[in-house]
Amino acid sequence: AMKEEVGAKAFYRTGGMSFEKTRKFFLNSYGLFTDQTFYMSGAQISVNARKGEGDDIQGRTFPDGHGYMAQAGYEFIDERDFIAGARIIAHEALELCFAPSAPVGVRHAIILPGEFNLHGGHETIHGFEGDRCLGTEWTLAGGSFFMRILPQIGTFRFGSEHVNIVADSSIERGVGTYLYDDEGSPRQRYHLVKDGIWVGLLTSRESMPLLNARIGREYFKQSGGSMRAQSAGDIPLSRMTNILIEPGHLDFEAMKDSAPEGTVMFGSNKSWTIDDYRRHFQFGVEIAWEKVRGRWELRKNALYYGDNLKFWRNCLGFADDRSWVLYGLPNCGKGDPIQSMKTGHGTSPAYFKDVNIGIAGA
């Protein structure tokens, strides 16, 4: 379908599906015995295109740049039209080869789920893991800026009043959904950020008393049930479950219509970097659009960067639940020796002011 759409200019085309069944037994000295079975399905296609030999290469993926996975069977794959998706991304990849580069400067930004689930729901939330806040976990981009301000949990302003972030290990189809974690704690749903205020962390039986000691009071009453191990031969680590950025009340089309001239809309993620304390970041995307004279025009090689606290405090809102999307990341890495784990991430399009925007490779 990709070759039919743009011919030989779609010179590199890939696709794949993944299906897993995992059965997990857990027993502890308190008398708990659990037997859980998980079915995971996922698929992704991608294309690289160029105008001619030696020219600029642009790539697109479908449905998302970091995989498309859920706790479901083949019906999950059937729900998306991959043939139509292949034609769309082949056409977009070639269009990007002819498109202007992204603008440079401070602009309003709309960030779509294909990018924001990685930035807002994944890379940022690594900093909410209890072990990183204690300084006992530093692999793969370090600790957390919260480790320096732990006594301020419950009062510290993380973002604007529009920001609500939940850890939920019970949502249907989430790849981070289960009945019990690998310490035997039951699944839970709780806020990490409530109305912009930092109120929670991803905790465990191991980290909870240590965090309370650092906080200076008994803030956490029970484990957050976030401990998971890659296999029976690995030590459980504090892990993201399904991280859900709650939808707002804005109609997505109305959000786009009301955005000022020069606003940039960011699509699927393709690159990321974040500092040792999860504070300063830079993210690049496969595809972007700039609002010019009321129309959304294609832009390539777009990135945005900044300070996570200033960024989240500049949030103007989120689209409503009609635009909310749940993704499953199949390969979140953590630990030494490294372990891979599936984590779920949900968001609707997010709207921000005063975002630093630039060009990848410039």
Question: Can you annotate each of these PLM segments?
Answer:
Residues 1-362:
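N-terminal small-residue-enriched
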